[in-house]
Amino acid sequence: MNKLLILFLLLNAALTRQDNHASANNKPMLYNINSAPLYFEKFITQYNKQYKSEDEKKYRYNIFRHNIESINQKNSRNDSAVYKINRFADMPKNEIVIRHTGLASGELGLNFCETIVVDGPAQRQRPVSFDWRSMNKITSVKDQGMCGACWRFASLGALESQYAIKYDRLIDLSEQQLVDCDFVDMGCDGGLIHTAYEQIMKMGGVEQEFDYSYKAERQPCALKPHKFATGVRNCYRYVILNEERLEDLLRYVGPIAIAVDAVDLTDYYGGIVSFCENNGLNHAVLLVGYGVENNVPYWIIKNSWGSDYGEDGYVRVRRGVNSCGMINELASSAQVV
């Protein structure tokens, strides 16, 4: 066997052992920046990355190197969150926001949804932890791909849970229907959670995923009303002012689609994120539960970046500190017919 190939395989095995060490412990070993070229080649193979030219490859490598330096800084913090190289590692943060989030800014829609202010005293006797997944009311994690339509995954995720709560059955609803047939929101270029519900009300219902499958791009509307699986009876937009009251709302209403700033979450791998700033809301996700680990309270959030992201597609953020700007007026949920 070629000596260079043997050397590469040995180095790759060493890097793999380092990655395994990272996942086996609470805090990972820091990436060796001098090994960035090897990390990058492994990354290209693992995620089947293809670049149009050597210039683009160099450009992506420089971003990749910067991102692993940032990951090292995050992993040096005094919290339990772990960050690792993932499929976004060759992308600058603004590109990730453009391609893989999709929450619109400003007011859209007809505002059919009732507005509820989430504030005031919380219930005195509250369970320490709560998770809708344990009751089989959450559908599987999905992947929005390179389409800025997080708003539809979050809104339909909440609607799927409402259907499961009411009918004790999980169904996957069609995100593609909203991409193609919601003409108020902007398909793969952004939208709002509550306007998705308003548009489902206007359409008359929503089909199941297998009847109107996801393409991750806008196509001509092919609505089939006879295939509607359910619809929206009422929708609600929440002005969240109090996280303890949000706990009560989550337990009594069901999973809630919320808006966050996802920039600090792009390279998340596991643990509880304690440092997540809000420099502008850009992503919609589904709030499904909460808990406490090592005296640190946290929220459980379902993302739409596939099951290989984070903790099987989920992320935990610290509760009670407005993590990622989640205390805002863009949260929403709906009742199914």
Curated annotation (Swiss-Prot):
Biological processes, Gene Ontology terms: proteolysis
Post-translational modification as stated in the protein's UniProt record: Synthesized as an inactive proenzyme and activated by proteolytic removal of the inhibitory propeptide.
Molecular function terms from GO: cysteine-type peptidase activity
Maturation-removed propeptide residues: 17-126
Disulfide bond sites: 147-188, 181-221, 276-324
Signal peptide: 1-16
Recorded superkingdom: Viruses
Record's keyword terms, sorted: Disulfide bond, Hydrolase, Protease, Signal, Thiol protease, Zymogen
Enzyme class: hydrolase
Xref: InterPro entries: Papain-like_cys_pep_sf (IPR038765), Pept_asp_AS (IPR025661), Pept_cys_AS (IPR000169), Pept_his_AS (IPR025660), Peptidase_C1A (IPR013128), Peptidase_C1A_C (IPR000668), Peptidase_C1A_papain-like (IPR039417), Prot_inhib_I29 (IPR013201)
EC number: 3.4.22.50
Any one Pfam family match given in the protein's UniProt record, by short name: Inhibitor_I29
Catalytic activity, as annotated: Endopeptidase of broad specificity, hydrolyzing substrates of both cathepsin L and cathepsin B
Active site: 150, 283, 303
Described function: Cysteine protease that plays an essential role in host liquefaction to facilitate horizontal transmission of the virus. May participate in the degradation of foreign protein expressed by the baculovirus system.
Similarity remark: Belongs to the peptidase C1 family.
PANTHER family: CYSTEINE PROTEASE FAMILY C1-RELATED
Name of this protein: Viral cathepsin
Organism (species): Spodoptera exigua nuclear polyhedrosis virus (strain US)
Gene that this sequence comes from: VCATH
